[in-house]
Regions:
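Structural motif
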Residues: 142, 458-460, 494
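Conserved catalytic cores of phosphodiester-cleaving nucleases, focusing on short active-site segments
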Residues: 427, 451-466, 480
Length: 514
C-alpha cells in the first residue's frame, strides 16, 4: 500500500496509485447545496488535498474519480473554469510580501485573460479577472483559496503588520460577494477564524462548516475509515509489535485519535501521523515535530497563563472561534491549531470543555513547554523524565528530589511575575510528563500542591509548601491522613515534604520519611 504522505495533489494521488480515503461525497453535497464555504482545520489535516480534489471535480476530470462516490453521484460533469490560490507558499514578514504573492497569481491570470489600465489594486484586478474568465468561457467561475490566513498567522505577533494583511485580504475576498453573478462556487480553508474585524466581515454569504455536524469528517480519518481503508496496515502494525488487531487499534487510537470539531462529535484521527506510522511501522510524534508552537509558548509566558486551565476551563463557541493578536488569549489559537480539542459540551450553558486530543499532542506539547519553565535544555525533556521515572521505580525519592531542585535552580530569567504561579505551572508540566509513565494524581489549588505517585513497588506522597518548611508539609500529610488509603497496600510508602522559596524561586528544603 502506498501512503500519500505530504502529497496534496489529487491527480497525483489517483494516477500514482496512492491510497485515497474517499471524501468526494462531501464535495458533491457542498456543490449541490450551496455556493460559498469556509473550513478551518489544523495544519496537515488534509485541507490542501481536499481543495485539489475540488479542483479536479470542477474541471470535469471524471477519469480521476473512478470507483469513488462522486463517479455515480455526479451525472453532468460540467466543466467550470477554476481559480486556485494557495497562500501557504509565501513568507509574510513585510507589507510587500502578501502583495507579491497575490500579484504572482494575478499576473499569470492576466496573461491569459487580459487587464484594464484602471485595475490598479489587487481587489480590482481580481474583480476584473473573474468577470473576463466567466465571459470567455460562458460559464461561472470556481474560486478555491487554500490557507487564506497564512499571512495573518505569520504576523500574529506584529499587530501593525497583521492589520495591514487583514485590510488587504478583506478587500481582496470582498470580490467574492460583489462578483456573485460570475461565481459558481467558492471554498476557502485555513487554520484559524479571525474575530473582531474579520477578513470575512463583508461576506455574509459565506457559510462556515468548521463545526457543522454534516461535515465533521470532511478532513482527517474516522474510526470506520481506518478499518475500511487501512485494516491490513493496522494488522501489519500489530504483527510488528507482537499484539493482536484490537490491541494495535487501541494503541493507534490513544496516540493519534481524539480530535472533535463540534459538541458530541465523532472521533477524528490525525491523518499525517497515522500514515507516517503505517509507513515506518513506528509510533512517533510525526505531526507535532513538523512545526514547533514557539509563538504559542510566548503567549502563555507573556500572560503568566495558569497552565492547568488549558484543560479545566470551559469556554463559549464564540470564544473558540475568535483569534486576534490584540490581547489575545492563547486558548482559541491552541484549539484552532490542533493542540486542544473539544472534550465535552454543556448544553445548558452552551460551553465547551477542552483538552489535549491525544497522547502525541499532550506529551509533545508538555515536553516542549518544560524547558521554558525550568532549568532544562531544549530537547532534554525525554531524558529528564526518564531519569525521574527510574528514580521512582527504584525507590530513590532523595535522587528524585535532587533532580527536581535542579530544575528550579536559576530559572528567574525564564519566567517573570508571580513566583507561586511559576512553580504551579512547572509542577503541572512535570507531573503531566510523569503521568505518561507512572500512575500520578495531583492537586494544584490556592496555597496547596500535592502529588501521589505509584509504581509497581512504591507509593510516594508529596506535599509542597510555600515559604514554610519541609516539616510543616510532612505534618500536613499526617494530619490530613493522606497515607490512610494505602495502609493495606504492600508497596513501600514514602512521604516527602517540600518547601518552595518564593523570593529565591527555588526548592530550598525537602525531607523524606518512609
Amino acid at each position: 500500500m502506498k501512503f500519500p504522505i505530504g502529497i496534496q495533489n489529487f491527480p497525483k494521488v489517483r494516477q500514482d496509485g496512492y491510497v485515497y480515503v474517499d471524501k468526494t461525497a462531501f464535495i458533491y453535497k457542498l456543490a449541490s447545496e450551496g455556493s460559498y464555504y469556509f473550513l478551518s482545520r489544523p495544519r496537515r489535516f488534509g485541507k490542501s488535498l481536499l481543495i485539489s480534489t475540488m479542483d479536479a471535480y470542477f474541471r470535469g476530470r471524471k477519469e480521476l474519480f473512478h470507483g469513488l462516490a462522486l463517479e455515480t453521484l455526479e451525472k453532468d460533469w460540467t466543466v467550470y473554469p477554476v481559480v486556485h490560490i494557495d497562500l501557504n507558499t509565501g513568507k509574510y514578514d513585510s507589507e510587500d510580501a502578501l502583495f507579491h504573492v497575490l500579484n504572482d497569481y494575478l499576473c499569470k491570470l492576466e496573461d491569459i485573460y487580459g487587464k484594464y489600465p484602471s485595475e490598479v489594486t489587487p481587489e480590482l484586478r481580481f474583480k476584473g479577472i473573474i468577470e473576463r474568465i466567466a465571459k470567455k468561457h460562458n460559464q461561472r467561475v470556481v474560486i478555491l483559496v487554500d490557507e487564506y490566513d497564512k499571512p495573518m498567522l505569520q504576523a500574529i505577533d506584529n499587530p501593525e503588520l497583521q492589520e495591514h494583511f487583514r485590510n488587504t485580504l478583506k478587500a481582496f475576498y470582498s470580490v467574492l460577494k460583489t462578483q456573485d453573478q460570475y461565481i459558481k462556487f467558492a471554498f476557502l480553508t485555513g487554520v484559524t477564524k479571525f474575530g473582531k474585524v474579520s477578513v470575512f466581515s463583508d461576506l455574509n454569504n459565506l457559510v462556515d462548516i468548521s463545526m457543522d455536524a454534516r461535515y465533521q469528517g470532511i478532513c482527517g480519518i474516522t474510526q470506520d475509515e481506518l478499518m475500511t481503508y487501512f485494516k491490513s496496515s493496522v494488522q501489519d502494525f500489530a504483527d510488528a509489535y507482537g499484539i493482536n488487531l484490537d490491541e494495535a487499534a487501541a494503541k493507534l487510537k490513544k496516540r493519534y485519535d481524539g480530535y472533535h470539531f463540534r459538541q458530541r462529535g465523532v472521533d477524528i484521527y490525525n491523518p499525517f501521523s497515522l500514515l507516517n506510522t503505517f509507513a515506518t511501522g513506528e509510533l512517533g510524534s510525526y505531526w507535532f515535530e513538523t512545526s514547533t508552537p514557539s509563538f504559542l509558548v510566548q503567549l502563555l509566558k507573556r500572560d503568566n497563563y495558569y497552565l492547568p486551565n488549558l484543560t479545566e476551563e470551559e469556554v463559549s463557541g464564540d470564544f473558540l472561534n475568535s483569534v486576534d493578536s490584540v490581547d489575545v488569549s492563547p486558548v482559541p489559537i491552541l484549539y484552532q491549531s490542533g493542540y486542544l480539542t473539544i472534550k465535552d459540551y454543556d448544553q445548558r450553558f452552551q460551553t465547551y470543555a477542552l483538552g489535549f486530543p491525544n497522547e502525541e499532542v499532550s506529551e509533545g506539547f508538555t515536553e516542549y513547554l518544560l524547558p521554558y519553565y525550568t532549568n532544562m535544555e531544549k530537547n532534554a525533556s525525554p531524558m529528564f523524565v526518564g531519569q525521574f521515572v527510574h528514580d521512582m521505580e527504584k525507590g530513590k525519592p532523595e535522587a528524585f528530589m535532587k533532580r527536581m531542585a535542579v530544575l528550579f535552580a536559576d530559572t528567574d530569567y525564564k519566567i517573570v511575575g508571580d513566583a507561586e504561579l511559576y512553580f504551579q505551572n512547572a509542577f503541572y508540566l512535570i507531573t503531566k510528563l510523569l503521568g505518561f509513565y507512572t500512575e500520578v494524581e495531583h492537586t494544584i489549588s490556592d496555597g496547596r500542591i500535592d502529588m501521589i505517585a505509584k509504581t509497581k513497588d512504591y507509593i510516594y506522597i508529596f506535599e509542597f509548601k510555600y515559604d514554610r518548611s519541609a516539616d510543616t508539609a510532612l505534618r500536613q500529610i499526617d494530619e490530613k491522613g493522606y497515607a490512610a488509603p494505602f495502609a493495606a497496600d504492600p508497596r513501600k510508602l514514602y512521604k516527602v515534604g517540600v518547601n518552595f522559596n518564593r523570593e529565591k524561586r527555588c526548592i530550598d528544603e525537602w525531607k523524606v520519611i518512609s
